[in-house]
């Protein structure tokens, strides 16, 4: 089996250029970063390898960046793997034995590891040992192999799917939450400086408030607005230009996109506002269940537009009000033209 394993310098140039190198550069998540800084520095001061860390939260909020920061803080190497690729012990063997003392082993989507591989990881995390089976058949024997002490960093969008034995082996657990518009605007200012984009503060705030509290999306939208301004507005990036660019992507003032609106209007128009089951909704809007649950629902629930009940999903009165207001705005714009 071929592992998609990478180290820091193999990331895409764009992502690396924007990725914060240390906790001082990491904007937002103040309580989490304060605890993490204390946790790491205490271990460094004692001359120990930091304990294992677990970060959980919606996609795009900086869990991978935090893994890189852990490695940068302890000054060691970073090895990256993806949970779905770790199915059996042999998938882990080469990775674990390649680690040097103090290295950080980052497993993204750790909740999707195979059960057998996960159990194989227990002794590696707790005792820095693994058992290797030599030969096969009647002559097979198990040999215990010592590993170099390392720090495992796991990231998951679904912490509830982690088994209790695995969760209990993490010394540090941190929830990465959605960002405020102000924090996103600060992140975008840093990104625009790094990328050489000349944008005024009002434009950055306009992008921030439509970015669903997610830095990854904010940076992607910043690039889109840059491209739009380059081709349509003579490289001028102000709030009006940002609004035009984001309207072209069908992103409204709350950050709702075409799929969000389709999801809400489907429940309203075809299921009388709900409740409707997630599988039925998946077929109706043409998105798989996992994408709806991980990408779209958390933000809609956070904004108070959707609620989950024991019988299914329901839209709220706020959703009706918001979509009516958007419709009225579009109609008035059409009349002005």
Swiss-Prot record:
**InterPro entries the record matches:** AAA+_ATPase, AAA_lid_4, DNA_helicase_Holl-junc_RuvB, P-loop_NTPase, RuvB-like_N, RuvB_C, WH-like_DNA-bd_sf, WH_DNA-bd_sf
Matching Gene3D superfamilies: 1.10.8.60, P-loop containing nucleotide triphosphate hydrolases, Winged helix-like DNA-binding domain superfamily/Winged helix DNA-binding domain
Region of interest called Head domain (RuvB-H), as start-end residue ranges on this chain: 253-337
Recall the taxonomic lineage recorded for the source organism. Bacteria, Pseudomonadati, Chlamydiota, Chlamydiia, Chlamydiales
The residues that the entry says bind Mg(2+) are 64
Q: Which organism is it from?
A: Chlamydia abortus (strain DSM 27085 / S26/3) (Chlamydophila abortus)
Q: What is its main location?
A: cytoplasm
Residues annotated as binding ATP are: 18-19, 60, 63-65, 126-128, 169, 179, 216
* Localization terms from the record: Cytoplasm
What processes does the entry annotate via GO biological process terms?
DNA recombination; DNA repair
The subunit field of the Swiss-Prot or TrEMBL record says: Homohexamer. Forms an RuvA(8)-RuvB(12)-Holliday junction (HJ) complex. HJ DNA is sandwiched between 2 RuvA tetramers; dsDNA enters through RuvA and exits via RuvB. An RuvB hexamer assembles on each DNA strand where it exits the tetramer. Each RuvB hexamer is contacted by two RuvA subunits (via domain III) on 2 adjacent RuvB subunits; this complex drives branch migration. In the full resolvosome a probable DNA-RuvA(4)-RuvB(12)-RuvC(2) complex forms which resolves the HJ.
- Report what the protein is called: Holliday junction branch migration complex subunit RuvB
Which gene is transcribed and translated to give this protein? Answer: ruvB
Q: Which reaction does it catalyse?
A: ATP + H2O = ADP + phosphate + H(+)
Q: Which family does it belong to?
A: Belongs to the RuvB family.
User: Which Pfam families is this protein grouped with?
Assistant: AAA_lid_4 (PF17864), RuvB_C (PF05491), RuvB_N (PF05496)
